[in-house]
């Protein structure tokens, strides 16, 4: 009888462990864009610093990390690892996606964007300029494609978990250094028909995302509005994306849980009081709650 109770107890414990809420993070950081891979078209930034800053904090909070840095962060590697990461996600997981890269507006060809431009995350091997039969945009990670992964993640996580998506990039930057400052992104649109990108001024800093009883909630944190530049900050002689740095500060006091609103308040408090947020740059949030 005692042996039977022991076996039943072991199965019960295994069931509890198997259904325990897991914490998982997928992070991409690129610094050294200035390579022959893209004909030296992009300036270098400091995206790897962001991932290196956040990784030990998330590990301490029990997150399992999947990271791609610099040369690892090709389009193929990002999409392949993100597919695997998504497929391995389970009900109730707390999932954190993070991109510290360049961004670029891309001419919309399927007509789903009001302003005529998609937004893209730029892998290490994506060119800045369209050139027929040489580079036609296949290595740009478009927001439409990223949204496909996000919908699948939310479905797999279900209503008992949460998804965070952090974009510390920019789709309207000047891609240049001025006064010892580094900007992420470019104001040059990736266009197939010589279309000129003209960012429209936007006042909104919060958007609603569709919610579903069968999906997890999601919160996007984005470093700036579409018409603004994402200016890196300097802390103790190291440069970071401002959003990444302020998230790191918020995590010191408020670990990531399913309470996304509470965490957002901590990030905003760091931005307001920490002294490391660029002028004329607004945090943008998108939430399903």
Regions flagged by a language model, labelled:
Residues 4-5, 165:
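Residue-level detector of intrinsically disordered/flexible regions characterized by low predicted structural confidence
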Residues 20-289:
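Cysteine endopeptidase catalytic domains of the caspase/legumain-like
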Residues 5-18:
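Hydrophobic h-region of N-terminal signal peptides that target proteins for export
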